[in-house]
Amino acid sequence: RRVAHDDPFGAWEVDLHGHQVVYRVAGSGPPVVLIHGMVNSSRHWRPVALRLAERHTVIAPDLIGHGDSATPRGDYSLGAHATVIRDLLSALGIGSATVVGHSFGGGVAMVFFWQFPHRVERLGLVSSGGLGPEVSPLLRSIALPGASALVSLAGAERVTDGLERAGTALRRRGSGLGVQLQAIARALRPLGGPGAREAFVHTLRAVIDARGQRVGAADRLYLLEAVPTLIAWGERDRTIPIEHGRAAHAAVPHSRFVELEGAAHFPHLEAPEALAGALLDWIAATEPASLDDEAWRKLLRRRASARPRAA
């Protein structure tokens, strides 16, 4: 069912397993799936999605617990989100796609590839989580007991409005920090609702604890050599360090690394033209992967070997 009419990046909704999932669609052509990060939504992809839609069908879901999708008491793990995306694509009749994820969404995108490799033609990671333990102190603090009050404060209207006003003032003065403050304000606004706050805390604690990111992809990065991989990062990212992206690029043969000038942790909002251009160039320059069970088995057996267990 369509929700938003006369919008080139219009919203639709579908019931999956008894829960409402909202997603946005634009354009026509080979499919590209855009997966947002924590406390973001499909709306934040708009400027990038509209550029990609010139050549592609773009599908951007609101993850469960985010945006306008349902906020049930349930499983907010990376694997659970990946399964919902699989079922959404199946409901839409899409077999495989280029999959791009930002921040937490990058972790979802990687897990989606590991769980359903035959459905991923290319993999794009934008300021992605899961590539190293370091993460901002603010996110680590939210993993601590009793942090719900901090989340409530962060999503308060007076806080987000203040950030928006400060960002507008800085942009008028020509400061790049203004765009970053406005991006943070947009990210925090959904936390104004109690259901979204609870979902955010559950989502964050599934991947982050007081010491940093506790779910990592380092032991499986070798699998990405089987799929065209783009790693894009904001040069000023202080939430997840750009060194994670550089290290992942070095570990994944034939991957492409793009450093986005002037962007911090939200390149799709801070440098949308540069990010969209990088994605379009990468898609045009690569052939889609097509992995069947036999190809996946061969890839795994390069690192895995069965042997009798010692008594």
Regions found by a protein language model. Give the residues of each.
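Catalytic histidine-centered segment of alpha/beta-hydrolase-like enzymes
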Residues: 260-276
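Acidic beta-to-alpha connecting loop that harbors the catalytic carboxylate
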Residues: 28, 235-237, 262-264
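Active-site loop/oxyanion-hole signature of alpha/beta-hydrolase fold enzymes
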Residues: 16, 24-26, 60-104, 277
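Alpha/beta-hydrolase fold catalytic core
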Residues: 1-32, 54-56, 94-95, 181-182, ...
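Flexible "cap/lid" loop of the alpha/beta hydrolase fold
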Residues: 114, 122-155
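Hydrolases whose catalytic domains are alpha/beta-hydrolase-1, hotdog thioesterase
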Residues: 108-112
